[in-house]
Amino acid sequence: MAKTIAYDEEARRGLERGLNALADAVKVTLGPKGRNVVLEKKWGAPTITNDGVSIAKEIELEDPYEKIGAELVKEVAKKTDDVAGDGTTTATVLAQALVREGLRNVAAGANPLGLKRGIEKAVEKVTETLLKSAKEVETKEQIAATAGISAGDQSIGDLIAEAMDKVGNEGVITVEESNTFGLQLELTEGMRFDKGYISGYFVTDAERQEAVLEDPYILLVSSKISTVKDLLPLLEKVIQSGKPLLIIAEDVEGEALSTLVVNKIRGTFKSVAVKAPGFGDRRKAMLQDMAILTGGQVISEEVGLSLETADISLLGQARKVVITKDETTIVEGAGDAEAIQGRVAQIRAEIENSDSDYDREKLQERLAKLAGGVAVIKAGAATEVELKERKHRIEDAVRNAKAAVEEGIVAGGGVALLQAAPSLEELNLTGDEATGANIVRVALEAPLKQIAFNGGLEPGVVAEKVRNSAAGTGLNAATGEYEDLLAAGVADPVKVTRSALQNAASIAALFLTTEAVVADKPEKSAAPAGDPTGGMGGMDF
């Protein structure tokens, strides 16, 4: 395909037009008085959202240079969303301000590489200042306030704080759609996985259709169990102990399954068979998680263990196991606390090293099952459009709350960024590097000014007032008051704020140092086939 090339100022301005088109659509959503954006969908109802990254992903521009500019800013939003789960609009606003100021200086003759170095040093300094000023999140109320701001709804913040209080900071909080109005919180203690009993005959509570085993032994097998002779030696030992048995295997079928069912019906021996969750390597990893949680071992030929020779010492234990037709919950496994912590650390390291969003999500679920519990927030709304928007807001707020617990919080509303600007004086830079630092100083005001503008206030006046206020004091855009924002519950996770700045600066530096852009040449659309006169050939009128 033929290419088109733009150089120098033309290239940079083309990229900037694309950036501005995207940023102008995104920035109207910033702050408590920000508006929504409607996204058309090819099928189904449109999406209404105020989430920066969702809006950015939908924007495709026609002009090839503008398209590249918009794609670069999408990266800012996506990266910020991946790292912190929020702050995508702030990152986009910062990127726009940095590029606007930077290109003005490049056009005036500044050296782009000098500006880039100055920007990088300034961002490093501001990040350091933000981290130093961050306050640890210690109370449920602080989590509720931070999550409430992210969701734009305090009741959502309160529910997320309650969920985190119950399942711990490492616990998984999932959001599901509900058929009812309002919000509900469901909690699961222990490890839960999405596989139920293989046969309905294992049920011990007919009314609830559950099988409940108190203080059972747990047999974990990585292969199928078909013949009863493999199981018999171990079954005899378990029967002598008088405890029930939970079998988790790839599958339990044929003779082995019918023997277990017959003994359960006769009341000779209480047991339940469940299929192991997952597939392939993920199944092996989850079985190993269960083994560590329950203090047992996985019976697998890979480690030289077989059912015929297995001893009762290889079985795991738990205080209670509840099995329904769809899921199994293991409560209070008897595993060694140190071994569980070791496994948690291993999974955390895998999350850090994983490039795949899907793998990371699955690892996060495994981590939660070992370290905490699972909380499910069920969200309902009047229409499907509102439901999708609400669910998305809650998911963002959950990630925001976790980021707050991780690194602490700073004053929200763009105030922390603006009030970190004086720290740049300590850098003592000269020449183009000093100009680069000044570009960052100007850009740090952009989020606050945009929040003020969206709230119907004069941005310059608000910025001047906040600049001369005490640290942490700024505009609460929801009320229009100037107050101590942390005390008023207007806080942002420092992880969100610093990620937004770092990612925006990274893309801005690339913009400024670009000297040529190579893009696909737009193809001319072919003329439609048929008679060019529009008549019907061979017809007399």
UniProtKB/Swiss-Prot annotation:
ATP binds at residues 29-32, 86-90, 413, 476-478, 492. The gene is groEL2. It is found in: Secreted, Capsule; Cell surface; Secreted, Cell wall. It catalyses: ATP + H2O + a folded polypeptide = ADP + phosphate + an unfolded polypeptide. One of its GO terms (biological process) is protein refolding. Keywords: ATP-binding, Cell wall, Chaperone, Isomerase, Nucleotide-binding, Secreted. Forms a cylinder of 14 subunits composed of two heptameric rings stacked back-to-back. Interacts with the co-chaperonin GroES. NCBIfam families: GroEL, PRK00013.1, PRK12849.1, PRK12850.1, PRK12851.1. One of its GO terms (molecular function) is isomerase activity. It comes from Mycobacterium sp. (strain KMS). This is Chaperonin GroEL 2. InterPro entries: Chaperonin_Cpn60_CS (IPR018370), Cpn60/GroEL (IPR001844), Cpn60/GroEL/TCP-1 (IPR002423), GroEL-like_apical_dom_sf (IPR027409), GROEL-like_equatorial_sf (IPR027413), TCP-1-like_intermed_sf (IPR027410). Belongs to the chaperonin (HSP60) family. Gene3D superfamilies: GroEL, GroEL-like equatorial domain, TCP-1-like chaperonin intermediate domain. Together with its co-chaperonin GroES, plays an essential role in assisting protein folding. The GroEL-GroES system forms a nano-cage that allows encapsulation of the non-native substrate proteins and provides a physical environment optimized to promote and accelerate protein folding. GO terms for cellular component: capsule; cell surface; cytoplasm; extracellular region. Its EC number is 5.6.1.7.
